[in-house]
Amino acid sequence: MKIAILSRDGTLYSCKRLREAAESRKHSVEIIDPLSCYMNINSAAPSVHYRGRRLDKFDAVIPRIGSQITFYGTAVLRQFEMLGSYPLNNSVAVIRARDKLHSLQLLAREGIDLPITGFAHSPDDTGDLIAMVGGAPLVVKLVDGTQGIGVVLAETRQAAESVIDAFRGLNAHILVQEYVHEAQGKDIRCFVIGNRVVAAIERQAKAGEFRSNLHRGGSANKVKITAQERAIAIKAAKTLGLNVAGVDILRADRGPLVMEVNASPGLEGIETTTGLDIADMMIEFIEQKTQRRIATSSTIGKS
């Protein structure tokens, strides 16, 4: 197979591991910076061009698109989909997952338990918004933030009002969420491929920090998840239409709560913690899906 990895930086751990896994399974791989792509959009002969050349068709595309380039990155991914390439995660699902508010609304509609979350526009609603999520302490999140950036713990009502007003002064869209005390700065990252949770780790925030993201100095350990946690992680990924997802879960007294679903989960933390070859599992999943596509096309052609 010919596989394209859409990424701005091919030296990142996840990109290198995916390339190694694909090449070890005898596939050819090209890492493509989506911002260096340009597209010919027409019904007769659509194409993707890259640094002065027209790209040949790829059998599969793996999107590793940063949140800052979601709009253009998913446009490029969509063009590859038009050309018949199999997307590990399709453009619609990636966009869905990147919109934190929309994704939470979709998860809630499917009955998936979440931290109590508020969203408002008018400054006049700040007081009731804080009360609606259970009061302080609470968490204020930028809708467009990633890796723990733009996430603030407000320990008092006055602090919460100040943080919310400051973000609004920047014309930023924010979510206000209850702070789950019993989680104690920990969360569970479930790595979903298809209909399986293939790995799970527990992430612990460093001392003096409440965000458990490994990028912010948190630590990780292998963890055994419950059947309920496994089921909710798979359902969350499926609800957003993702074949591969990192589903972050808080262990609350009332049961597991889905905090976030990541469409481009990093491999370094989970592979080094569990010792599992997640990259190889992802390539194997692509092989299975593309083989089924070929088989289906062959059957249709004969009918």
Curated annotation (Swiss-Prot):
Mg(2+) 2 binds at residues 260, 262. GO terms for cellular component: cytoplasm. Gene3D superfamilies: 3.40.50.20, ATP-grasp fold, A domain, ATP-grasp fold, B domain. Mg(2+) 1 binds at residues 248, 260. ATP binds at residues 141, 178-179, 187, 211-213. Disulfide bonds: none annotated. The keyword Ligase applies. GO terms for molecular function: ATP binding; metal ion binding; ribosomal S6-glutamic acid ligase activity. GO terms for biological process: protein modification process; SOS response; translation. Binds 2 magnesium or manganese ions per subunit. This is Probable alpha-L-glutamate ligase. Residues 104-287 form the ATP-grasp domain.
